[in-house]
């Protein structure tokens, strides 16, 4: 073999080895795009693959075929602001001082010292955008552009916080609903008919503009929170009235976003997540969703209040058509994204743990031993532990036995006092009909120990306990 041939062979071996090393580095240091689609007040039973037979959701159904469907995914809390704080920070909302739903001109908001998903990814060079509903404080220092987002188009709080609220006057005194572009009010909304379309168009445009760079796109749709609005192209299309029409348009929006990803050749490099902030607002009757087969809805710790439809698609690592039954909570999304993107977590304590090995099939176990269900101002209502769900005595609201609302007008809740500990086996009794606490004393004791440990850390107003680890929200005062 001549020296020339030997040189050529060695050169090719060097090139191949170097290419292999580079490929390995790229797989380790991958920066997949992240798209988080987050609807408002959508029930578990409002998607075809989760049981809806009167609403067509072809794009979400296809997303389940192409990715994983989680049957035990929980929002961080059963109400707007708190839920959003949890999914964006990886913390229980009460850890960071976020409770309930902020009203307009609130002097409280998400503390800028907390690290959001957007800030975590921005530090890795991601372009970041939010199109939709913010609801984590409408003072300038709390707005999305101060919390890691490069771009913002949408409304600062819920779409019903406007002068056309059905209880305007007797209960509320809302001003005009502002529409923001970054930090500027560009319009006040008197009609929301085309808002879903505009949010979708902005999302598609953002994907097109950032096809050559890693990006994080957060799409917190204001719908199907009341008041319901749908564009003409979907009006009257469903078998479930206006509410079903709205869900069909949201499904269309998901399809448009997925199409934009595909048309830009980004399918294998993009993680797409779909879920909702809490269960349906049952007081609104035919303008609310369905959480069946689960009990109750928004504003409660029962399964219907926080168990949400959840889909995740990432062909590179997540097999299609997979169903995952292990419990996961919204607080686990941020650390999961951190793992897959190799992003650095904040030094501050958070509650979430990565569920990435569960999503990819490398594990069958929940990332956490237990999940804790707080509501109102730091009241611990319940705990999910494996297949078990335990509730502590507390007051909750129900529409059972009440006249439901109709056509945009709410019905009146009835308040119920849960007077003793109740325990349910969710594998056998997902509808939480039969209290079996007395038959499982060892389980009750175990969960009480877990709850007491959490109370020491984050407190429990029902027990007059203050936590040692709570952080303050942001304040303008």
Describe the function of each predicted region.
Residues 2-4, 19-422, 428-449, 453-456, ...:
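Formylglycine-dependent sulfatase
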Residues 3-11:
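Sec-dependent signal peptide recognition
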Residues 12-20:
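Hydrophobic h-region of N-terminal signal peptides that target proteins for export
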